[in-house]
């Protein structure tokens, strides 16, 4: 698939920022290939890292995040696999990180293990669309 390289600033909700050169596949191109069902409204990313440890009730404890189709199709939203002309380091989200340049860092899922297209978050963990959203953060973390 075609790739995109972009130099952008990462803004953290904690107040720090940094600039990096990211390369990856535009998420919009991937969505065009899979042809989402009409009822799909959100792109949900499940990640390899666990935030809560094992749960007794069988819930998935892995980090997860979501964006809507407008952000998913934005030209700067990519599934990044390179950072600064090198393979993406584990510390920065390898094997795959979703870069959503119009939103704060907590919306940019690292260690992506799977991608789902969903209509609702109602049955996914806390029902708010992401790990931090379930903890009280806003669902749209725009900058």
Q: What is the predicted function of each stretch?
A:
Residues 1-143:
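Structured, non-membrane catalytic/scaffold regions adjacent to prosthetic-group chemistry
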